[in-house]
Amino acid sequence: MSLIVKICGLSEPETLEAALEAGADMVGLVFFPPSPRNVDLARAAELAARARGRAEIAALTVDADARLLDAIAREVRPDWLQLHGNEPPEAVAALRETYDARVMKAVALATRADLAKVAPYVSVADRILFDARAPKDATRPGGLGVPFDWRILEGADPGLPFVLSGGLHADNLSEALALVRPHGVDVSSGVERTIGVKDADMIRAFIRAARAASSSPRPVDGESPAFQRSEKAG
């Protein structure tokens, strides 16, 4: 299976269209008011309607309550819930059972020891997203444009398909993919001219770079122990 490319934090129809036309596999919508990429439900529903059938839709939340999650499920109908907070494994399992969406759990990395945080989620999530650990004074857990040491993931077996995130952009993607063999890559700030404002040319450049850097086949879910599929039926 080819590398999955996800453009996250989209908030305008024009840049969403740029991502879709350039061949993005997934698009992410952020539901977290402290983020400059936050979208309200009405805008999210509009964007999701444009993307549906052309790319998978991920709804990014941070320790969201049931009211918000219910509204997202009803109005946006995402394919994925992308959880970037401190959601414990039992909460992730409950969300996976409650909503008609697969679950991607973000895990922040700073050292190789942080990989131990993945194990409790292997049986309750469908995919892991590795991001850089946010600074202590950060107001949001991701989208900060900060990479982590990709060598942390060299030879790692997280037990689930995983997405590489954190500080990626068109100019460093080939270096990252030379060290790590992810199921997919995720970018947000790396395709922005200013914080929270996506740039269509940068989106296209990132997707081109991802395709060029991933010319060899990617692992398929279930192909090996490191990529065991744990997806909700249906």
UniProtKB/Swiss-Prot annotation:
Keyword field contains Amino-acid biosynthesis: yes
Disulfide bonds: none
GO MF term list: phosphoribosylanthranilate isomerase activity
Sections of the chain in a coiled coil: none
Domain of life, per lineage: Bacteria
Database matches in CDD domains: PRAI
One Gene Ontology biological process: L-tryptophan biosynthetic process
InterPro entries recorded: Aldolase_TIM (IPR013785), PRAI_dom (IPR001240), RibuloseP-bd_barrel (IPR011060), TrpF_fam (IPR044643)
Name of the featured protein: N-(5'-phosphoribosyl)anthranilate isomerase
